[in-house]
Amino acid sequence: MWGGTCQKQSWRNSSQTLSSCLISRLDHIVMTVKSIKDTTMFYSKILGMEVTTFKGNRKALCFGDQKLNLHEVGKEFEPKAAHPVPGSLDICLITEVPLEEMVQHLKACEVPIEEGPVPRTGAKGPIMSIYFRDPDRNLIEVSNYIPS
């Protein structure tokens, strides 16, 4: 599969480039949080994510074909990021729910909106986005793709 393109050669010094990406999709992201309980409550109540338990008592938030694995600060699992800290995540989530409904839902749940709706550029084209923060102060962007 690798075709020997990087054999015994530092990737930093390599002039080789691939003709296509080797990665097909994102599977999961690990979030380091202050409180698993507060995080699971927020994401399940506010965004409707499913809380799942795996490998003993580890927790994840599932949505679509993705998940957010949760590590509590100071109790991370190995291997882990070099500097795992709560509040360092900035992610964009796509919803089919109209943003105006999301805005009303967030207001009803007393989640302050930091910005939006505002136009942005998503991975597949123009999006309309709103921004708010979770209990760890991670920046959460929820967006609708703008029909072309």
From Swiss-Prot:
CDD domains on file? GLOD5
Query: Cystine bridges: which residues?
Result: none
- Where do the VOC domain residues begin and end? 25-145
Q: Which residues form a coiled coil?
A: none
SUPFAM superfamilies, per the entry: Glyoxalase/Bleomycin resistance protein/Dihydroxybiphenyl dioxygenase (SSF54593)
| Gene designation | GLOD5
Q: Which PANTHER family match?
A: GLYOXALASE DOMAIN-CONTAINING PROTEIN 5, GLYOXALASE FAMILY PROTEIN
A Pfam family hit:
Glyoxalase
InterPro entries listed in its UniProt record: Glyas_Bleomycin-R_OHBP_Dase, Glyas_Fos-R_dOase_dom, GlyoxalaseI/FosfomycinResist, VOC
Reading the lineage from the top rank, the first entry is: Eukaryota
Supply the name of the protein: Glyoxalase domain-containing protein 5
Identify its protein family: Belongs to the glyoxalase I family.
